[in-house]
Amino acid sequence: MSNPDYCIPNFSQTVNERTIIDIFTICRYRSPLVVFCLSHNELAKKYAQDVSMSSGTHVHIIDGSVEITASLYRTFRTIATQLLGRMQIVVFVTVDKSVVSTQVMKSIAWAFRGSFVELRNQSVDSSTLVSKLENLVSFAPLYNVPKCGPDYYGPTVYSELLSLATNARTHWYATIDYSMFTRSVLTGFIAKYFNEEAVPIDKRIVSIVGYNPPYVWTCLRHGIRPTYIEKSLPNPGGKGPFGLILPVINELVLKSKVKYVMHNPQIKLLCLDTFMLSTSMNILYIGAYPATHLLSLQLNGWTILAFDPKITSDWTDAMAKATGAKVIGVNKEFDFKSFSVQANQLNMFQNSKLSVIDDTWVETDYEKFQAEKQAYFEWLIDRTSIDVRLISMKWNRSKDTSVSHLLALLPQPYGASIREMRAFFHKKGASDIKILAAETEKYMDDFTAMSVSDQINTQKFMHCMITTVGDALKMDLDGGRAVIASYSLSNSSNPKERVLKFLSDANKAKAMVVFGAPNTHRLAYAKKVGLVLDSAIKMSKDLITFSNPTGRRWRDYGYSQSELYDAGYVEITIDQMVAYSSDVYNGVGYFANSTYNDLFSWYIPKWYVHKRMLMQDIRLSPAALVKCFTTLIRNICYVPHETYYRFRGILVDKYLRSKNVDPSQYSIVGSGSKTFTVLNHFEVPHECGPLVFEASTDVNISGHLLSLAIAAHFVASPMILWAEQMKYMAVDRMLPPNLDKSLFFDNKVTPSGALQRWHSREEVLLAAEICESYAAMMLNNKHSPDIIGTLKSAINLVFKI
């Protein structure tokens, strides 16, 4: 091992700034994985050959010929090395669901950032199955199933996508898509948290720091009610107590927030109804049929009293089954003329909070019909037996009208072609206001002339009604409180010391505050190597100025893992969150990542990690990171597998010598399973307490830690979560009884059902000590000492005695 000639080939021959920038670029389409479950092995073999020959796709088949956990281990350990290889990867799973369930395979696929397709219930001649398989071949190396999610919402309209393309902003669109995926995952993670902590359904409310419209939609997809908290709200400029009656819709107002909304333009009521469902769990829906836009929502705990002459018992049953809501369908017209709670079964909501959605119209004398509705709703607001939270009424008045209790009069997103508005009634609405027909006509002329994006963006006026104005850093952090603070609390208007104090208090209070922020050192590294980012970025220490292609400019503070760990927070990746929440996740997936998104990291409180996440299974594993970066760099440099491990042995040898350990006390092996053998007992002084090595034991330093240190230069790397898991699993642990054993395929399990330890404390801390030398070797001295330093500092905090 001491032979000085043992240095060829090496990494310095190949790795330069261009190599590093190329790795950043590859990350945009990393994990091109599709996990495809079907019941027909011969069909899998046929299409495996087709897609491999046509597009060079790496194909794996799990067919039951090998015990399932062993098969999963071999397959996904192999895939872990291929995730940055630029080639599509397809795994066909043909074993029965009783062997490996849909839920387990979905968790595994998403843990590796893949697309998941379940068709084991389809016959061999099923048109759906054949179509999906044909698409697999024809679309390769892409696939038309999103990664890490059941649905996908891309460009709102084709003209908007065309505008982006002609203005060289298509990369930014991928950034927005992934940002929306991120927000969706954060919501799904909160839903998982609510389930695990058994939070009552009526208390499942999440506070969202910083406005972004899709949170309303994605919260209702997960059975959660959202509220926003903002430091201030721009004056809408309209009439009424909150300025929401015909608010100003000039460009300045509309472009003040994000334009992108992930809604299907064919589902015009989605914006309105998800907002209204956020205001109460008791809903009177008048003119409900067909309400297909509600079928993808999760409404467990909601009660919906639906009126429509077209309603059938089948419709009622289907709506209840799809959404989980208690649905009472009434197949008749609502009686607006009878000023009685009993007449329309509203007595069932006595002493309850109720919101009302009206989507009714008639062909004859629509003006008179609207007047009847208005009078009824004004009357209903004044009832004391029912706490009416909010009423939305379809509004197409053609005459001047006096209105009571009117809180807002807003254009209907997606409703320009039918010149439709919505009136909102509330106890705090204007007591008596005149709405002029000519004024609303002119207003709708202006609205119709706007772009579709700007029309959709007017939903922000609705969301003002579920927004609290205040300082998020002063909110109560009682146990069970859920807060999403992504792309928000890191804003430069919030001093870092206050943010860190707030997060520390949240951890101590056992609240669930999910925090997202730019990663200071990764961003600095990207700029240092000359990476061209999707957003123009300037840095002054940890103050970052962003300017994106849509014209927005803002400033954030960057944060590091070590300072957040000091505050009681642990980094977790979006991939880990979506895999961990896969049993409840009902959000969107994505197709392409962006370098901009990889500059951010997300953190959760340490109390939750210690309670729920110390037992590592594939959902919480960094398996999608630990092999692919080192394998890519090693292959680029043609460094043999054996040589790579011998290099690691040399680095350990140098470190031990630097600590005055006599070389006769150990024997360097430098293999994949053994770094060195301890010949005689010795100890190494360390800030976490002495590292103790007993005679006649083998030491295998943590390759995961070293690989994560390389990955951390390019993408979010959950080093501290992994270190917490290693500390907990430094001894054998029994398999948890409530989890499928297949999720632990990457672990070694003893005959008694215990998970064998991953590494000793010494093996982890020794790896941390050579981490910078290792990164310097792998990246030819073009590594970031700051990234390595903060990781090492945080790991030492985890293991400090």
Swiss-Prot record:
One cellular component (GO) term of this entry: virion component
Major localisation: virion
UniProtKB keywords: GTP-binding, Host cytoplasm, mRNA capping, mRNA processing, Nucleotide-binding, Nucleotidyltransferase, RNA-binding, Transferase, Virion
Pathway: mRNA processing; mRNA capping
GO MF annotation terms: GTP binding; mRNA guanylyltransferase activity; RNA binding
GO biological process terms, semicolon-separated: 7-methylguanosine mRNA capping
Residues that span the membrane, as ranges: none
Residues of the signal peptide: none
Localisation: Virion; Host cytoplasm
EC class: transferase
Domain of life of the source: Viruses
InterPro entries given in the database record: P5_Phytoreov
Database matches in CDD domains: capping_2-OMTase_Phytoreovirus
Keyword Lipoprotein set for record: no
Catalytic activity: a 5'-end diphospho-ribonucleoside in mRNA + GTP + H(+) = a 5'-end (5'-triphosphoguanosine)-ribonucleoside in mRNA + diphosphate
Family: Belongs to the phytoreovirus protein P5 family.
Function: Enzyme involved in mRNA capping (Potential). Binds to GTP and might have guanylyltransferase activity. Together with the RNA-directed RNA polymerase P1 and protein P7, forms an transcriptional complex positioned near the channels situated at each of the five-fold vertices of the core.
Protein name: Putative mRNA-capping enzyme P5
Organism: Rice dwarf virus (isolate Akita) (RDV)
